[in-house]
Each structure stands twice: as C-alpha cells, then as structure tokens.
C-alpha cells in the first residue's frame, strides 16, 4: 500500500537515535503517521519541522501498518512559527486540538484548507483572536458539533444575539435569554458580525470560554485543554488593548 499527497507536518516524536514517528495532516486522507529514517540528516532536519507543507509519500506492506514516510519540502513556515512566541503558542494549540479531535485516516478537507489559510496568515503577520476562535469553531464543526451563531435558536431572529445555549449550541437573543442569562454562555459580537473585531479583553475571554465549554463537553471529556491554549490566552490578554 502506498499513496502520495500534500500534507502539513503536525508532530514529530523521536523513538530511537535516528528514527522518529511523524504525524501529518494530508489533503485527501486525513491525519497520517509514519516512521522516518535518517532523522538527523541535513535535509530531514529542515523538512520535518512543525507547520511545514510537504509532498508526502506513505508506504506499508498492509494498510493497517504504521508505514514509512518520505517527504519533500514544498513550503517552510517553521522559522516564522518558532521565532515568535505568539505564533508558536497559536500553532501548537491548534495542532493539539486537531490531534485530540480527530482520529487518524478520517478525511477532513475543510480542516486542511483552514490550516493552509492560517499558515499563510502567520506568513503575512495577520494572525489574530478572530482567526484563532474561528479555527476552533471549524474544528468543532468538522468533529460534528457545529455552533449555530447566526440566528436565535428560539425566534430565528438575527438581531441582538448575545448568548449561546450550552445545551443546543445555538445563539439566543437578548430578549429571549434575559430570564435565563445565568445559565447561558456569552456570545461575543465579533463572532456574529464578520466586520467586527474584539472590543476588549472581556470579549476575548468570553470567546475562549465559549469554545472551551463545547470542547470539554463533546470532545475532550476527561482530558484537559492544551496548556498552550491557556498560555496563548494569557499572552493575548496581557498585550492586547
């Protein structure tokens, strides 16, 4: 068995002096892992870095085997990721959530395209809170837990959406939600309107709380959110506004 595809390097784990297991997100086959040999060669040291886009080749005698991989570098983002603390936390938090949320060998084409989009945002210096939270919302959606934030789940109206139901994941308008607001999650304005950015640190905190609630409820269960996510939020709150 073998195939070739475009892929993004997500993880590398050394298992012997010159061997490692590398995990990638492929465009057409989902998350895949395999063994790389000659780990410390000059070429492989450059290729197998987190965030790099590669031409990925996987081969194994049987499909259920771990297999071996061979890659050629297509585009490197590793320097941009490693040279900036915010970029590093941003990327590693999303990698960990991706690996926690999806099984290997499940196709998620939208997820791959979102990863490409965000790597290019890092390249152009355009990463921000809105991009990050929208990525988390996409992960939830691809995992089968879409939040419906564009209209009220009770009245179907699209105005004054300021809450989210923790049960249904649907937006709730101010009028409908007022009697139950102590039981509802806050919905930041910038997640409803495309032309809005976070107004203050409270909106940022509310956005992180919103997605965290549904990750904990549906995906992580007894696992914990990545520590890199916590550090990213701390970094954002310290240096924003």
Swiss-Prot record:
It comes from the Bacteria. GO terms for cellular component: bacterial nucleoid. The keyword Ribosomal protein does not apply. Gene3D superfamilies: Nucleic acid-binding proteins (2.40.50.140), Recombination protein O, C-terminal domain (1.20.1440.120). Pfam families: RecO_C, RecO_N. Keywords: DNA damage, DNA recombination, DNA repair. The keyword Magnesium does not apply. GO terms for biological process: DNA recombination; double-strand break repair. InterPro entries: ARFGAP/RecO (IPR037278), DNA_rep/recomb_RecO_N (IPR022572), NA-bd_OB-fold (IPR012340), RecO (IPR003717), RecO_C (IPR042242). Involved in DNA repair and RecF pathway recombination. Belongs to the RecO family. HAMAP family: RecO (MF_00201). This is DNA repair protein RecO.
């Amino acid at each position: 068995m073998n195939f070739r595809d475009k892929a993004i390097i997500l993880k590398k784990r050394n298992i012997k002096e010159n061997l490692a297991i590398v995990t990638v997100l492929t465009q057409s086959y989902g998350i895949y892992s395999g063994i790389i040999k000659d780990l410390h060669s000059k070429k492989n040291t450059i290729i197998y870095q987190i965030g790099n886009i590669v031409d990925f080749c996987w081969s194994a005698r049987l499909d259920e085997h771990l297999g071996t991989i061979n890659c050629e570098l297509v585009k490197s983002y590793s320097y941009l990721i490693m040279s900036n603390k915010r970029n590093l936390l941003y990327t590693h938090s999303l990698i960990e959530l991706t690996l926690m949320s999806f099984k290997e060998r499940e196709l998620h084409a939208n997820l791959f395209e979102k990863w490409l989009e965000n790597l290019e945002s890092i390249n152009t210096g355009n990463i921000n809170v809105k991009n990050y939270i929208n990525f988390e919302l996409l992960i939830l959606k691809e995992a089968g837990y879409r939040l419906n934030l564009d209209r009220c789940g009770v009245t179907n109206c699209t105005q004054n959406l300021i809450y989210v139901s923790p049960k249904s994941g649907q937006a709730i308008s101010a009028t409908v939600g007022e009697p139950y607001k102590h039981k509802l999650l806050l919905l930041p304005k910038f997640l409803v309107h495309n032309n809005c950015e976070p107004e203050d640190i409270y909106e940022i905190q509310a956005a992180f709380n919103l997605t965290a609630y549904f990750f904990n409820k549906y995906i992580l269960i007894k696992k914990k959110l990545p520590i890199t996510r916590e550090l990213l939020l701390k970094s954002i709150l310290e240096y924003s506004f």
